[in-house]
């Protein structure tokens, strides 16, 4: 398969699936980013992502992903939980320019669920039980991804979608860290989101850093804390001298409101940590206290 150095949707005449040469036509544009554009297609249940710059490395990474998908833990519920690349897409010259992926319908971005004001407006029926169910389903999905050796790397709440039944879907999966099990080549996740980067990765150059699922454990714990409490665990009322450090510095120092000798305490009118089941509380303490100096002690997604 040949790979063109760049691709412009306006220049496109024909797209075909790499696996069987089935024609694919693009419909309405539904999202755009620095990497590429996501389109509706003529294939029921599928979207296409077309890259602005489909580099050799990007396409090789996709080939590994297409050939080794994770098990979808929600298939028995007739729900797409992982918007995984399903097939490469070629243009009329045979160059790979993007990929097909399953569409996730009738779902909201995670912040509209964990933010109390947005939840009241957009999902008033989402109660304490549904928030727990969403957290559990998120952990199941991440466990399935880890089981295949993948690392999410950059967890954006906007890339986790939730429907009215608390069923979860992860999108933007082509940004994950991928390891080719045959060659050992690692296709890294080169970016990170503020507030979701564990202490041992702060200041690291992600383009040359191999990540592990241990790093994802911190990210998952932050995400679940957002879901159950509505705010970031490394936030609250600063009790030290001077102005409160920014969130990245609080993570670096291990200052969260449940930490020993922490200079952060819960803000007024926030939900206390001990309101959740003792086992969930133990997981948070294990992750943010013990895991600060010994990352391998963070609870796994499983």
Where do the language-model regions lie?
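Conserved end of the kinase activation segment
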Residues: 201-214
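Conserved C-terminal segment of Hanks-type protein kinase catalytic domains
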Residues: 296-302
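ATP-binding glycine-rich phosphate-binding loop
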Residues: 12-57, 79-80, 91
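Activation segment/activation loop of eukaryotic-type protein kinase catalytic domains
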Residues: 158-201
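Conserved structural core of kinase catalytic domains
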Residues: 80-134
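Catalytic-loop of the protein kinase fold
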Residues: 142, 146-165
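Conserved C-lobe activation region of Hanks-type protein kinase-like domains
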Residues: 213-215, 224-281
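The N-lobe alphaC helix and its flanking beta3-alphaC-beta4 segment of protein kinase-like domains
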Residues: 54-78
């Amino acid at each position: 398969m040949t790979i063109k150095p760049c691709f412009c949707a306006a220049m496109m005449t024909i797209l075909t699936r790499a696996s069987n040469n089935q024609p694919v036509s693009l419909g309405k544009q539904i999202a755009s980013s620095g990497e590429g554009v996501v389109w509706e297609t003529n294939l029921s249940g599928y979207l296409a992502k077309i890259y602005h710059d489909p580099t050799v490395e990007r396409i090789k990474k996709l080939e590994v992903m297409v050939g080794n998908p994770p098990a979808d833990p929600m298939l028995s519920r007739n729900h797409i939980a992982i918007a995984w690349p399903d097939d490469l897409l070629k243009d009329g010259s045979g160059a790979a320019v993007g990929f097909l992926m399953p569409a996730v319908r009738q779902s909201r971005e995670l912040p509209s669920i964990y933010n109390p004001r947005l939840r009241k407006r957009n999902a008033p029926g989402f109660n304490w039980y549904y928030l727990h169910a969403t957290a559990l389903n998120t952990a199941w999905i991440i466990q399935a991804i880890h089981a295949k050796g993948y690392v999410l790397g950059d967890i954006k709440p906007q890339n986790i979608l939730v429907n009215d039944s608390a069923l979860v879907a992860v999108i933007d999966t082509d940004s994950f860290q991928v390891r080719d099990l045959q060659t050992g080549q690692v296709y890294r996740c080169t970016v990170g989101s503020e507030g979701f980067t564990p202490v041992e990765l702060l200041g690291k150059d992600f383009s040359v850093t191999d990540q592990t699922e241990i790093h994802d454990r911190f990210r998952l714990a932050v995400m679940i804390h957002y879901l159950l409490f509505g705010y970031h665990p490394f936030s609250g009322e600063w009790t030290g001298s001077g102005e409160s450090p920014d969130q990245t510095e609080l993570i670096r120092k291990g200052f969260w409101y449940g930490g020993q000798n922490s200079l952060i305490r819960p803000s007024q009118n926030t939900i206390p940590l001990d309101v959740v089941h003792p086992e969930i509380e133990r997981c948070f303490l294990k992750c943010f206290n013990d895991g600060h100096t010994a990352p391998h002690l963070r609870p796994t997604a499983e």
